[in-house]
Amino acid sequence: MPTISVLIKPASGMCNMQCDYCFYCDEMKKRSQDSYGFMSEQTLKNVIRKTMIHAEGLISYVYQGGEPTLRGLTFFEKAVEYQRHYNKHGIRVNNALQTNGYLLDDAWCKFFKENQFLIGLSIDGTKQLHDMYRHDKNGNPTFDRIKSAADLMDQYGVDYNILTVVTQNAAYHATEIYNYYKRIVFFWCKI
């Protein structure tokens, strides 16, 4: 039975960070409307209902951005609620979310664990390498906050992966990054 994979962008291209290499910043400037705003709960409900009607095997919902957590935890709680409500045939459902981790707190991590979300956490190696490109909207470094999000996911037992953008500088420091990831041992992270 074929898998249905659905990419959902709850916050369009909106983000709470300003990474130097992010293509969304340039792309949004080129649009006649820079952001399409947040996805409505009605649209979310329709997407889930229709995929459940047509599914025969696994459904994979993947939330990306911009930064999907900007849509708020309630949106994702509704997603799980709709999945349970419309899943009349015992279809297996996977949820995954790619995040910069900036907004993750206890409530998010508890939700991810309880609902078996696979999280992709964007972190670019060591503090020095990460903070070289990944800033908040005011140009401040973000590594400490993102590392705290990883620690919190470890504490809650959330299954997550690391997504590292390989810039020219990161490629030059690939061994250092790899050894850092091994040394830190992101507990639930797949390296």
Task: Please annotate each region the language model reported.
Residues 66-67:
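Active-site neighborhood of divalent metal-dependent phosphoester/pyrophosphate hydrolases
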Residues 48-49, 53-62, 71-191:
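Radical SAM/AdoMet-radical enzyme domain recognition
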